[in-house]
Amino acid sequence: MRNSNVVLAVVVTFNRLDELKVCVAALKSQSYESLNILVVNNGSTDGTKEWLTQQSNVIVINQENLGGAGGFYTGMKYMYDNGYEWLVMMDDDGIPDKNEIKNLIQSYDKVVSAVGKEVILNALVADKDDKDYTAFLWARGSKRTNKILELQKERFFDDIHPFNGTLVKRSVIDKIGMIKKEMFIWGDEKEYMARAVHNGIGLYTIPAAIHYHPKEKGKKGNIIPFVSKYQILVK
């Protein structure tokens, strides 16, 4: 296929049918038209498989529960084997803003030109219940903030919260390979981003691209800038 404009959005799901319905509806409403949707169903037992059989314009892969890592590996492999140029990854409890994918794609070449290297881009993860604030507290220099408008003063910045609206280009996969499926549900996104940084690939958030997510997932602690953290991991 190798259509440079087509994006494959991959959603990994396990027993969260209500959230999945909202996520898929948001993807179907994206302003970016050259978009295909793939749902990787990790052995759900809550009616997800049956609901997916009724959906039009959604590619479905049903598999045993291989965790988030196994789900995203399956999605990434499908993207690569079927010739897509772009991949956007998200969990089933996230909701992409209607312009999320368009803003990520339109930002890609601009960021590459500004930083002089290949990149992985991420949407800004907003609190789905209070859309003026992010789902995670951000460290910007000596300041900490969760205010969307304050963060949107920058065109992009170099921290990310991966697999919440994460854009990966085919050339990045050529360079660093696939997600490690054996990691199941722990650390797969961190390991993949560490591998990216170790191979000279930048990680940047695009504040104009918004991905809504439950705030409680961000209560584990304040954000640590991913670049510094990953440099420690890959030594």
Regions found by a protein language model. Name each.
Residues A26, N41-E50, G94-I95:
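A conserved acidic beta->alpha catalytic loop
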Residues A194, G202-K235:
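Active-site-adjacent helix/loop segment of glycosyltransferases
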Residues Y84-D93:
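Short beta-strand-to-loop acidic/aromatic patch adjacent to the donor-nucleotide binding site
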Residues T166, V172-G177, E182-A209:
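A short, conserved alpha-helix in the catalytic core of glycosyltransferases
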Residues A25-S34:
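Short, acidic, metal-binding catalytic loop of nucleotide-sugar glycosyltransferases
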Residues N99-A135:
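Conserved donor NDP-sugar-binding/catalytic core segment of glycosyltransferases
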Residues T53-Y78:
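Conserved donor nucleotide-binding strand/loop of the catalytic core
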